[in-house]
Amino acid sequence: MLVYLLPGSFDTREAHLDLLWEAGATGLEERGPNIRVYFDERTELPAEVADGEWHEEAEQDWQAEFKKNLRPVHAGRVTIVAPWQREEVPAGQLALVIEPGMAFGTGHHATTRMAVEALGELDLSGKRVLDVGTGSGVLAMAAAKLGAAQTLGVDIDPITIPIARDNARDNGLTSGIRFEEGTLGLDEDAEMFGEPYDVLVANLYAELHDLLAGEYAAQLRPGAPLILTGILTSKLPLVRDALDREGFTDVQVRTDSEGAGGEWALVTARRED
């Protein structure tokens, strides 16, 4: 069995995980100080993930090991599980089923979990929610499960859109939710957004939040909440300055309390009335 040992964790190497899948990885597993990346054959890897080591190991059922070690993610009122974990959702919790290894947003990263928790703290009944950078659609689907009447997930990566639509169907979400390729601030994409939203959530990196802060304000009705994550704590000043520049109020910060030393942050704010 061919294994590539990459130093770090899913949290610290989050930005590089898609590169491994694109290079032909057949599975990823966090174990000790490394991410174990399984391949069928040795392949040339991008420079960003070239600091690991190749190993030949005795054959084992890594898929069985992966399934055994994967745990449900409890995010407020929502529990995110893999398809084989449906029976592990506690009574009273909303189940959100995501296949691990799909587009970004399986729920196992701290930023996704914090965003789902923040959505669960809002009354979304009858609300319109916009998810920017939707990836697998996990945040849009969480909003729909939590009662949103209309949810739109947008992403500039066309590969993610059919994946998000499939995930929604697999979760029984067939109306009131849609996914479209596009982004904020482009004239050709303006029509897809419609009227201002009651909630906007975005799991992107800090520099994009800085760039898009004005568009966030334009897409929200006055007084509506904004939820931003994907932010390294070291980048919080950049995001705070952007929100202040665009007139957002009630800016609050929370950091990840589980693993990774609290290096990830979530910021909530409200559009100025």
From Swiss-Prot:
It is found in: Cytoplasm. It comes from Deinococcus radiodurans (strain ATCC 13939 / DSM 20539 / JCM 16871 / CCUG 27074 / LMG 4051 / NBRC 15346 / NCIMB 9279 / VKM B-1422 / R1). It catalyses: L-lysyl-[protein] + 3 S-adenosyl-L-methionine = N(6),N(6),N(6)-trimethyl-L-lysyl-[protein] + 3 S-adenosyl-L-homocysteine + 3 H(+). It comes from the Bacteria. It holds the Pfam family PrmA. Its main location: cytoplasm. GO terms for molecular function: protein methyltransferase activity; protein-lysine N-methyltransferase activity. S-adenosyl-L-methionine binds at residues 112, 133, 155, 203. It is an enzyme of class 2 (transferase). GO terms for biological process: methylation. Belongs to the methyltransferase superfamily. PrmA family. Methylates ribosomal protein L11. SUPFAM superfamilies: S-adenosyl-L-methionine-dependent methyltransferases. GO terms for cellular component: cytoplasm. InterPro entries: Ribosomal_L11_MeTrfase_PrmA, Ribosomal_PrmA_MeTrfase, SAM-dependent_MTases_sf. The lineage of its organism: Bacteria, Thermotogati, Deinococcota, Deinococci, Deinococcales. This is Ribosomal protein L11 methyltransferase. Keywords: Cytoplasm, Methyltransferase, S-adenosyl-L-methionine, Transferase. Its EC number is 2.1.1.-.
